[in-house]
């Protein structure tokens, strides 16, 4: 016997929320893949300074995001099917998956909050090491290539950790082509550009996580209400 009245409204409301959840999973998966293959981050995080690769903490978060997006699409489909079929078993499984996903999202949010400054800090340290090697050693071709990639990708020049007045002559050939010594002195600091690059992407991820968390809370409530409604309707 199918559900009636308010429970039937909850059934279709849950279906709509699950469809939105499925779409959100697709959007998160798409955004994560875009962040993974974004030319700016790819150019910088694929670099190597000698035997030392660029910090990959950012990519760890992206891989987690890809997995979350894929799981969300599966769970959203499961919720849609469970709601239409009025299956207590499927709805119970759906609720359990939501609880696990919500716990993982909270854990990922805590990890992201703790590491939000560390990601940019690690990249800036990597850049500073390459810049110091390139300035001190004329034969440090690998370091020069790393520095040039940073400068061309971010359209910046140099770091505040080195004096612009004492190193402008040495940095001139490392800055974007066409830059003069005078313009390089006033070009934006690479540390600031690195902060802007990663803070913008982390802000986007944070907004997406909050929206998904709100949807998940509503879905957990609706799935339990619908499950109870199905159980009560089967009694009568």
UniProtKB/Swiss-Prot annotation:
| InterPro entries hit by this protein | Tetraspanin/Peripherin, Tetraspanin_animals, Tetraspanin_CS, Tetraspanin_EC2_sf
Notes on the domains = Binds cholesterol in a cavity lined by the transmembrane spans.
What S-S linkages are listed for this chain?
Answer: 156-190, 157-175
Name the record gives this protein = CD81 protein
Indicate the family of this protein.
Belongs to the tetraspanin (TM4SF) family.
* Membrane topology classification: Multi-pass membrane protein
Subunit (UniProt): Homodimer. Part of a complex composed of CD19, CR2/CD21, CD81 and IFITM1/CD225 in the membrane of mature B cells. Interacts (via the second extracellular domain) with CD19; this interaction is initiated early during biosynthesis in the ER and enables trafficking of only properly folded CD19. Part of a complex that includes MHC class II/HLA-DR molecules and IFITM1. Interacts with IFITM1. Interacts with IFITM2 and IFITM3. Part of integrin-tetraspanin complex composed of CD9, CD81, beta-1 and beta-2 integrins in the membrane of monocyte/macrophages.
Look up the record and report any one GO term of the cellular component aspect: tetraspanin-enriched microdomain
Q: Does the keyword Cell membrane apply?
A: yes
């Amino acid at each position: 016997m199918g559900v009636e009245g308010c429970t039937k409204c909850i059934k279709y409301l849950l279906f709509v929320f699950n469809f939105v959840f499925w779409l959100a999973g697709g959007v998160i998966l798409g955004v994560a893949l875009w962040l993974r293959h974004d030319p700016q981050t790819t150019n910088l995080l694929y670099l190597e300074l000698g035997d030392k690769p660029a910090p990959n903490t950012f990519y760890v978060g992206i891989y987690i995001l890809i997995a979350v997006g894929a799981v969300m699409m599966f769970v959203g489909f499961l919720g849609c099917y469970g709601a239409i079929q009025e299956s207590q078993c499927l709805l119970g499984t759906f609720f359990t998956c939501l609880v696990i996903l919500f716990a993982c999202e909270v854990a990922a949010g805590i990890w992201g909050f703790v590491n939000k400054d560390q990601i940019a800090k690690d990249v800036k340290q990597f850049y500073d090491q390459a810049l110091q090697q390139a300035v001190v050693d004329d034969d440090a071709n690998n370091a020069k290539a790393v520095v040039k990639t940073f400068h061309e990708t971010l359209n910046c020049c140099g770091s505040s950790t080195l004096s612009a007045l004492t190193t402008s002559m040495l940095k001139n050939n490392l800055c974007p082509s066409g830059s003069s010594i005078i313009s390089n002195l006033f070009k934006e600091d690479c540390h600031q550009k690195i902060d802007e690059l990663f803070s913008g992407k982390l802000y986007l991820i944070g907004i997406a996580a909050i929206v998904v968390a709100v949807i998940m809370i509503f879905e957990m409530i609706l799935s339990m209400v619908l499950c109870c409604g199905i159980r009560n309707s089967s009694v009568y």
